[in-house]
Curated annotation (Swiss-Prot):
Highest taxon, organism lineage: Eukaryota
Gene Ontology, cellular component aspect: bicellular tight junction; cytoplasmic vesicle; plasma membrane
Modification(s) after translation: Polyubiquitinated by NEDD4, leading to proteasomal degradation.
A Gene Ontology biological process term: Wnt signaling pathway
Role of this protein: Inhibits the Wnt/beta-catenin signaling pathway, probably by recruiting CTNNB1 to recycling endosomes and hence preventing its translocation to the nucleus.
Organism encoding this protein: Bos taurus
Compositionally biased intervals (Polar residues): 804-817, 898-911
Lineage: Eukaryota, Metazoa, Chordata, Craniata, Vertebrata
UniProt-annotated location(s): Cell junction, Tight junction
Principal location class: other
Gene transcribed to yield this protein: AMOTL1
Protein name in the entry: Angiomotin-like protein 1
């Protein structure tokens, strides 16, 4: 079974081929594909040759390898199977089976087959090289020592799997191979190889010898391929090395005991017998010396450059250094070439891949050092070469062996080996034996046979590739079908579950409908039975129905009658309701008329009362006028008497008797004029005080009535709330209550109108009095003379008070004093009480002025009476009379009141004095807003106030 391991960076592509095709017992030699079939323009050691043609070939093949390794492994028409990767216990078992088959064939096969199979076994199990095929850099590693690291790092990118071997494993494998190299006692093959190649290079070899070494080279490549397949098996690396060591020891033991030698060993012996003692190339001893110590040196740098990504897949067979003569000769060839790196460059140049485009490379001459071992020696390569040195074709095949397995192998159709260019003619001194040429010819014949067999195997492999591709497609299709089947199973399961649920639901519905149908049938049967039973009672039911129908007709007639009666009752009730409404309206109208008539009656009564009061006031005024006339008469008589007394005094006086009559006449005239002016001023003051008294009384009465009205309204609202809260009242009581409220409101309106009328009357009276006073003053001013120095004031209340004391002393009685006290109490109890009491200090301040004029006037007549009178006039002018001040307005009020006759003897805090004082102050304060009354009414009131006797307190309110 052939395992071709392909590496593409980190991907592994493992292709299994049937074992009987490659490793059949009848195969004389193991075959690995000739590189000329796959890489027609391939050149070993790329980048190290001076020939441009070789460099071109090398770069082209490198590009092929790097760009598409899988495509390089097989021709483009082959089907690619990138994912056919089969590893594990199967491959390991296949490798074990391969070992058993080889051992079995060694026991029972022919000597030639045993020789080939033994080479295969030793190559697969006992090689000391690394377990992976080397790339370009590992091949270059064999040609030079110092620059090999650079070439390795530069050429390792296209491959990925060969970096996965541990460095320690590499060193162990190399060290395990060294004792076998030293213990091998076979003669060195390098000398014979180099010698025969050198001699043969001087003359063109015949075609049969060219084919025979090619066959050997191919057998060697096939051994490498077997080891490459063995790499792909999954075994531990150390165990592979140990097992390979054990197999190698067994093979050495068999070889030393006299078993059949391999073909390469015979070629080596023949070449040594003929040419070994004659020709000595420089440095064969050095090549031997490298056997012990120089062997592992190329392996270690190659192992050091590996990528530390872990070990590769473990395979059962490690390619180690062969103990067989084939492996030994290869090693010696390598070590010899290590001593001559300069010759290696020129040795590789003459062997390009056999192709028509590269035939001109054959002009290059051969070099004597044998570098074939270097190209075929893969110290770490899994395919050592055997007899490749005997022909340029075999050397070229072996030179391509390193890259052949480091890159994917393209399966190309085999090409003729005869296309290789003939080497240039060698020197005539070098000659080769006839046995060597015969061996080469046989080898080339075997190469042709094996090439044909390889072509057949390639065709079979292509068929297997096709089958594998089909199988892969079948697997994909099968996977797709399985996935579709799984999805179908899932959907079918789901549908079945849904169908089952629906079926259960429908079955339940069917059962329910069956039960319902059964119930309906039972009901129908019972209904039928009841119907059949009722048919017997049909006659009785019909008779009862007739009776009920007649009764129903009667009831309907009665119902109609009742409805008619009900309609009549409803109409009557509506008429009654309308009549009631009409009566209510008439009652309300009558009540309104009654209210109006009551209001008119009240107004008429008020007018009647007013007329009566006015008549009383008129009579009082008339009496007052009469009394005034009497008082004037008395005053006149008193003044006449005083005048007579003064005249007599002047007559009896001693001083100025002559001028006295002249003086007395104008002086008396002036005195009379002044007295008259005083009288007029006093009358004006009295009128003003009367007006103010009337205004104050009206204000007090209005305030009292307003307070009473507010209290009545409050009581009315309380009663309204209490009556609205009670539910048992009738509509008649509500009407009565509304009427009472209307009456009260009308009364209040009438009172307000009366008060306004009184105020207007008072204002009219005041203005009439003012007009009269002004007219009198204007007349007096026109009739005055130029004696204005004797007129200090228009009015002197002290004289008026003094003159009134004698005439009115006896006019005040005890009853009048009691009435005045009563009026004082009522005035103090009114709303304006606080205002009157607050002004009492004016009484105390002005009372000391009261006795002064009394004393002055009541004193006996003295010569200084006129002087004292003048003093009193000036003092009274400063502190009192007509200037609208409190003291000025006080004295005329005292003189005009009936109590002024006793004011001199009345204490300051007596109610007689307090009453007019408080009244005057209050009148002044109340007069400031301008409460006016009609002058006629005021004149009547002023005349009435001069009456010595007042009827009562109610009469005072009426006068107001």
């Amino acid at each position: 079974m052939l395992m071709l391991h392909v590496k593409r960076n980190t991907c592994e592509h493992t292709f299994k081929c049937p074992p009987p095709a490659c490793y059949s017992p009848s195969s004389p030699v193991q075959i690995l594909e000739d590189p000329s079939y796959f890489f027609p323009d391939f050149q070993l050691y790329p980048g190290r040759h001076e020939a441009s043609l070789t460099v071109e070939a090398n770069s082209s093949i490198r590009e092929k390898v790097v760009e598409d390794p899988l495509c390089n492994f097989h021709p483009p028409n082959f089907p690619r199977i990138p994912e056919v990767e089969m590893r594990g216990s199967e491959d390991a078992a296949a490798g074990t089976v391969l070992q058993r088959l080889i051992q079995e064939q060694l026991r029972y096969g022919t000597p030639t087959e045993n020789m080939n199979l033994l080479a295969i076994q030793h190559q697969a199990t006992g090689s000391a090289g690394p377990a992976h095929p080397t790339n370009f850099s590992s091949t270059e590693n064999l040609a030079q020592e110092d620059p090999q690291m650079v070439y390795q790092s530069a050429r390792q990118e296209p491959q990925g799997q060969e970096h996965q071997v541990d460095n320690t494993v590499m060193e162990k494998q190399v060290r395990s191979a060294q004792p076998q190299q030293n213990n091998e006692e076979l003669p060195t093959y390098e000398e014979a190889k180099a010698q025969s190649q050198f001699f043969r290079g001087q003359q063109p070899p015949p075609p049969p010898p060219q084919q025979q070494p090619g066959a050997v080279g191919h057998s060697y490549y096939m051994a490498g391929g077997a080891s490459q397949k063995a790499r792909t098996e999954g075994r531990p690396t150390v165990s592979r090395a140990n097992s390979g060591q054990a197999h190698k020891d067994e093979a050495l033991k068999e070889l030393k005991q006299g078993h059949v030698r391999s073909l390469s060993e015979r070629i080596m012996q023949l070449s040594l017998e003929r040419n070994g003692a004659k020709q000595h190339l420089p440095g064969p001893g050095n090549g031997k010396a490298f056997k012990a110590g120089g062997g592992p040196s190329p392996a270690q740098p190659a192992a050091k450059m590996l990528d530390p990504r872990g070990p590769p897949p473990e395979y059962p067979f490690k390619t180690k250094q062969m103990v067989s003569p084939v492996s030994k000769t290869q090693e010696h060839g390598l070590f010899y070439s290590d001593q001559h790196p300069g010759l290696l460059h020129e040795m590789v140049k003459p062997y390009p891949a056999p192709q028509p485009a590269r035939t001109e490379v054959a002009v290059l001459r051969y070099q004597p050092p044998p570098e074939y071992g270097v190209t075929s020696r893969p110290c770490q390569l899994p395919f050592p070469s055997t007899a490749q040195q005997h022909s340029p074709v075999s050397s070229q095949n072996s030179s391509v062996s390193g890259p052949l397995h480091s890159v994917p192998l393209p399966l190309a159709p085999p090409m003729a080996l005869g296309a290789a260019p003939p080497p240039p003619a060698a020197s005539p001194s070098q000659q080769l034996g006839p046995d060597a040429f015969a061996i080469v010819e046989r080898a080339q014949q075997m190469v042709e046979i094996l090439t044909e067999e390889n072509r057949v195997l390639h065709q079979e492999l292509q068929g297997y590739y096709d089958n594998a591709d089909k199988l892969h497609k079948f697997e994909k299709e099968l996977q797709r079908i399985s996935e579709a089947y799984e999805s179908l199973v899932k959907s079918t399961t789901k549908r079945e579950s849904l169908d089952k649920a629906m079926r259960n639901k429908l079955e339940g519905e069917i059962r329910r409908l069956h039960d319902f149908n059964r119930d309906l049938r039972d009901r129908l049967e019972t209904a039928n039975r009841q119907l059949s039973s009722r048919e017997y009672d049909g006659h009785e039911d019909r008779a009862a129905e007739g009776l009920y129908a007649s009764q129903n007709k009667e009831f309907l007639k009665e119902k109609e009658k009742l409805e008619m009666e009900l309609a009549a009752v409803r109409t009557a009730s509506e008429d009654h309701r309308r009549h009631i409404e009409i009566l209510d309206q008439a009652l309300s109208n009558a009540q309104a008329r009654v209210i109006k008539l009551e209001e008119e009656l009240r107004e008429k009564q008020a007018y009647v009362e007013k007329v009566e009061k006015l008549q009383q006031a008129l009579t009082q005024l008339q009496s007052a006028c009469e009394k005034r006339e009497q008082m004037e008469r008395r005053l006149r008589t008193w003044l006449e008497r005083e005048l007579d007394a003064l005249r007599t005094q002047q007559k009896h006086g001693n001083s100025q008797p002559a001028s006295l009559p002249e003086y007395n006449a104008p002086a008396l005239m002036e005195l009379v004029r002044e007295k008259e002016e005083r009288i007029l001023a006093l009358e004006a003051d009295m009128t003003k005080w009367e007006q103010k008294y009337v205004e104050e009384s009206a204000i007090r009465h209005f305030a009292m009535s307003a307070a009473a009205t507010a209290a009545a309204e409050r009581d009315t609202t309380i009663v309204n709330h209490s009556r609205n809260g009670s539910y048992g009242e009738s509509s008649l009581e509500a009407h009565i209550w509304q009427e009472e409220e209307e009456v009260v409101q009308a009364t209040r309106r009438c009172q307000d109108m009366e008060y306004t009328i009184k105020n207007l009357h008072a204002k009219i009276i005041e203005k009439d009095a003012m007009i009269k006073v002004l007219q009198q003053r204007s007349r007096k001013d026109a009739g005055k003379t130029d004696s204005s120095s004797l007129r200090p004031a228009r009015s002197v209340p002290s004289i008026a008070a003094a003159t009134g004391t004698h005439s009115r002393q006896t006019s005040l009685t005890s009853s009048q004093l009691a009435e005045e006290r009563k009026e004082e109490k009522t005035w103090k109890g009114s709303i304006a009480t606080g205002l009157l009491l607050g002004k009492e200090h004016n009484d105390h301040a002005s009372t000391p002025l009261l006795p002064t004029p009394s004393a002055a006037t009541l004193s006996p007549p003295t010569p200084g009476t006129s002087a004292s009178s003048a003093h009193a006039k000036t003092g009274s002018k400063d502190s009192s009379t007509q200037t609208d001040k409190s003291a000025e307005l006080f004295w005329p009020g005292v003189a005009s009141l009936p109590t002024r006759s006793r004011l001199s003897g009345t204490p300051s805090n007596s109610p007689v004095l307090k009453h007019p004082a408080a009244k005057g102050t209050a009148e002044k304060l109340e007069n400031s807003p301008g409460h006016g009354k009609s002058p006629d009414h005021k004149g009547r009131v002023s005349n009435l106030l001069h009456k010595p006797e007042f009827p009562d307190g109610e009469m005072m309110e009426v006068l107001i």
